[in-house]
């Protein structure tokens, strides 16, 4: 185990690129379309969330189960194995890894119930099948079970740089959630924020206890350039949390470091939050106007034959950007901005794909028939290849 993300197996062994993930789907694409393969990933992500919710497991377990499932199928095809059995096994293993163990009978019973509701009745009722699959799952993941999730980095950055940070208000998300936990708050924005605070604490983010990876997330801004992100308020934090939830329906957690995914969620959250987006747009327009005026004043000096070097020197300095501004915040990041833009684009593209596969995902029996068709096509192809091999021999 490691509290250092940079020394972890997740960083060194399990950051996959797009060609590696495409290679994993190569066999499936012989028997299904690319959109159908994407629908399978979203469908089983939804199933994992449903089973974890019914078993009263924490969000951390749900996130880990999703990562385990996608890691497994980054090495295997949907058509060669039973994704339903793998799905149930991922929940069972993730609960143990995240120190929220459940009995194997509960895992099998709840998985069987959820699968039946979605049209699949082939889940083995004996516990030995799930126990056996557990060993296959661990072996395929090379026993690398320690995970770093983006939620922790998001909370650390909110407390350090958000409008609700200790710098800004003196109250952390943990203090606010703890103080209001027994207040019986009703519905609405504050109630949702309290719920998020409790969920964050339950997720494992404890005040004053941060891993090295979380420290790196907080120090992504150069020490001399640290600013407070006023637009990063409670509403934006909630939106970022939901965005991170949605990333687990994609391969993003397998492709990028957690703190970069958290930063990308902040950018997307600010863009989707109308007041924050309007403020960013206004700031961009103001700065562009000031720069244009500055360049115009320099041009006037250069065009004036009577101007002196002292006048030019006094006008050379560019106007400084506002310190408490989202654009200034992201410009001061000590990270790769092209990589950040790439992750944001992946998130946007993922929402487009999820919208396209919505009809397929909502049809549980249709997904079951799709898998049966893929397996049958694979079986026929294997028999055909075997017969051809014998003929040539």
From Swiss-Prot:
Keywords: Activator, Cyclin, Nucleus, Repressor, Transcription, Transcription regulation. GO terms for molecular function: cyclin-dependent protein serine/threonine kinase regulator activity. Residues 51-146 form the Cyclin N-terminal domain. Its main location: nucleus. One of its GO terms (cellular component) is nucleus. GO terms for biological process: positive regulation of transcription by RNA polymerase II. Component of the SRB8-11 complex. The SRB8-11 complex is a regulatory module of the Mediator complex which is itself involved in regulation of basal and activated RNA polymerase II-dependent transcription. The SRB8-11 complex may be involved in the transcriptional repression of a subset of genes regulated by Mediator. It may inhibit the association of the Mediator complex with RNA polymerase II to form the holoenzyme complex. The SRB8-11 complex phosphorylates the C-terminal domain (CTD) of the largest subunit of RNA polymerase II. Component of the SRB8-11 complex, a regulatory module of the Mediator complex. This is RNA polymerase II holoenzyme cyclin-like subunit. It comes from Mycosarcoma maydis (Corn smut fungus).
């Amino acid at each position: 185990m490691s509290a250092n993300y940079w020394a972890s197996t997740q960083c060194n062994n399990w950051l996959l690129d797009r060609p590696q993930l495409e290679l994993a789907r190569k066999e499936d694409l012989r028997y299904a379309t690319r959109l159908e393969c994407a629908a399978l990933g979203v469908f089983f992500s939804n199933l994992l969330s449903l089973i974890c919710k019914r078993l009263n497991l924490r969000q951390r377990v749900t996130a880990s189960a999703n990562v385990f499932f996608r890691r497994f199928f980054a090495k295997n095809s949907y058509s060669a194995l039973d994704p339903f059995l793998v799905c149930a096994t991922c929940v069972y293993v993730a609960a143990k890894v995240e120190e929220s163990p459940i009995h194997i009978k509960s895992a099998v019973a709840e998985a069987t119930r959820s699968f039946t509701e979605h049209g699949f009745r082939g889940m083995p009722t004996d516990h030995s099948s799930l126990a056996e699959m557990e060993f296959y799952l661990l072996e395929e993941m090379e026993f690398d079970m320690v995970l770093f999730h983006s939620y922790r980095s998001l909370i650390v950055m909110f407390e350090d740089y958000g409008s609700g940070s200790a710098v800004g208000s003196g109250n952390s998300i943990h203090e606010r959630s703890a103080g209001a936990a027994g207040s019986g708050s009703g519905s609405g924005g504050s109630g949702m924020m309290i719920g998020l605070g409790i969920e964050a604490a339950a997720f494992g983010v404890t005040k004053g206890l941060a891993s090295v990876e979380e420290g790196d997330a907080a120090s992504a801004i150069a020490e001399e350039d640290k600013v407070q992100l006023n637009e990063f308020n409670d509403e934006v934090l909630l939106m970022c949390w939901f965005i991170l939830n949605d990333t687990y329906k994609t391969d993003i957690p397998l492709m990028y470091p957690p703190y970069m995914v958290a930063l990308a969620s902040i950018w997307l959250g600010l863009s989707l939050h109308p007041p924050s987006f309007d403020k960013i747009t206004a700031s961009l327009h103001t700065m562009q106007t000031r720069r244009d005026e500055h360049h115009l004043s320099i041009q006037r000096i250069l065009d004036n034959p009577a101007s002196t070097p002292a006048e030019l020197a006094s006008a050379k300095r560019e106007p400084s950007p506002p310190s408490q501004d989202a654009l200034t915040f992201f410009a001061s990041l000590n990270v790769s901005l092209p990589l950040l833009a790439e992750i944001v684009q992946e998130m946007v593209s993922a929402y487009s794909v999820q919208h396209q596969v919505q009809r397929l995902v909502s049809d549980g029996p249709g997904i079951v028939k799709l898998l049966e068709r893929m397996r049958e096509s694979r079986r026929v192809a294997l028999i055909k290849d075997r017969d051809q091999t014998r003929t040539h021999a």
